Amino acid sequence: PSSKGKTLFNLLPLKSHQSISSIMPLPENESEWKKLYVIFATLNGKIRKNSLDDFANIQSTGKIAMKLDEDDKIIGVIICREDQDIILSTRLGKCIRFMSKKLRIFKGRSSKGIKGIELGTNDKVISLSVLDAVDISPKIAKDLLKNGSADKAKRSEIIAKQKYILSLTENGFGKRTSFYDYRVTNRGGKGIIGIVASSRNGNVAASFPVNEGDEVILSTDKGKVIRCAVKE
């Protein structure tokens, strides 16, 4: 735990103005890549969808994946399927959820992307996540979860599929919210409040999907870590 880590410069030489923003595993079976997509999200709320197959061959010096404005940068890259939803979260506590299948697929790598979320003053995107889509409205799902005498089979199905969005703030506060509370909308909207960014809480540091039985490890910018159960 006390190790300072190893440099990745031997794997990917970076220029002085560049930094690593995302690391993701790929399916070992490359025949699956044609069915998958890569989602890019930027600090200023832009989003882009490419076929994973577009990046099947990358030279050792890397490949330009997306054009960016001078004041923008990539904050996250993630693999998704057509039947999944995308969630963008901002540092001032806003979240927006929309369908992956409604994003057009970009063929080249020269585009700056399209608007994923409309940001308020001084707000920036800090997290990109993927969730499995559900075929039930949030209102019906929440009603079934609250009503113990409801259709037991349907209620059990909803509980089994339920995930949570865990939002953590810079001052160490967290909030766990059912993903049924995040209704699916069109991309480019203002989103809803996922967690309040107040003087007590601070701005949002991270927001990501979890299961109730998961454990998470939280790390500070000084290298301290803590491990705790999501249900706590």
Language model region names:
Residues 1-232:
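Short, structured "edge-of-domain" segments at secondary-structure transitions
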